């Protein structure tokens, strides 16, 4: 079937944002008087749990005690606000080849969508900071983790994106950086282009249709359907 749309993950795929998430979590913990601190290795392990609130709940479970679910929800709101502030300051740019691929896709008539575990607020902040445009001006459909029943590796967010596009999986390609994202996209019936991120290098991505180092033109030449 002819390729009609590209569906992108966000964190680690469009930009190397996971380290900003970790920074925002740690700053929020300190500001709220919570004696939690996530090192890079801590966070690498915690990323196996998708979703910020879920990640904090997992850390609480690992420790055997911690904030209530209501407090975790409050912490997550504060963390999101801090993340948006950091992103808006312009500290994070797009990963190699992302802007160029999106430009080529638009010029060739391909439709664009997002399927992410993160919140819509985080998506909007990143796209505004990196493209200087509202996210909706670039991506026709944005399916965010706070809009579905189950987050990745469940297929819900990709199914929502496909529904919004009105396209079958065979007409789309998904772009991911993690095992949870890969499993989510595959469960939705999509073919997957995998670009490992800082936190996922070394993981087993043998289930991906293509694994390339980044989305630069030189790398994406390995995928004949891409413009």
UniProtKB/Swiss-Prot annotation:
Transmembrane segments: none annotated. GO terms for molecular function: hydrolase activity. Coiled coil: none annotated. InterPro entries: CbbY-like, HAD-like_sf, HAD-SF_hydro_IA, HAD_sf, PGP-like_dom2. It holds the Pfam family Hydrolase. SUPFAM superfamilies: HAD-like. NCBIfam families: HAD-SF-IA-v3. Belongs to the HAD-like hydrolase superfamily. CbbY/CbbZ/Gph/YieH family. This is Protein CbbY. It comes from Rhodobacter capsulatus (Rhodopseudomonas capsulata).
């Amino acid at each position: 079937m002819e390729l009609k749309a590209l569906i992108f993950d966000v964190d680690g795929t469009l930009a190397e944002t996971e380290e900003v998430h970790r920074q925002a979590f740690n700053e929020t913990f300190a500001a709220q008087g919570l004696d939690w601190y996530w090192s890079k290795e801590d966070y690498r392990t915690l990323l196996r749990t998708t979703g910020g609130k879920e990640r904090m709940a997992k850390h609480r479970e690992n420790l055997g005690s911690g904030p209530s679910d209501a407090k975790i929800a409050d912490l997550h709101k504060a963390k999101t606000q801090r993340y948006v502030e950091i992103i808006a300051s312009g500290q994070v740019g797009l990963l190699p080849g992302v802007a160029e691929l999106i430009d080529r896709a638009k010029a060739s008539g391909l439709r664009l969508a997002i399927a992410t575990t993160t919140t819509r607020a985080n998506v909007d902040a990143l796209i505004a900071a990196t493209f200087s445009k509202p996210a909706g001006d670039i991506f026709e459909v944005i399916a965010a983790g706070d809009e579905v029943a189950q987050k990745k590796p469940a297929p819900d967010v990709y199914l929502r994106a496909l529904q919004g596009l009105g396209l079958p999986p065979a007409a789309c390609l998904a772009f991911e950086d993690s095992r949870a994202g890969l499993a989510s996209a595959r469960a939705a019936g999509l073919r997957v282009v995998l670009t490992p991120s800082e936190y996922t290098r070394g993981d087993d991505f043998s289930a991906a249709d293509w694994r390339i180092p980044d989305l630069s033109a030189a790398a994406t030449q390995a995928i004949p359907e891409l413009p």
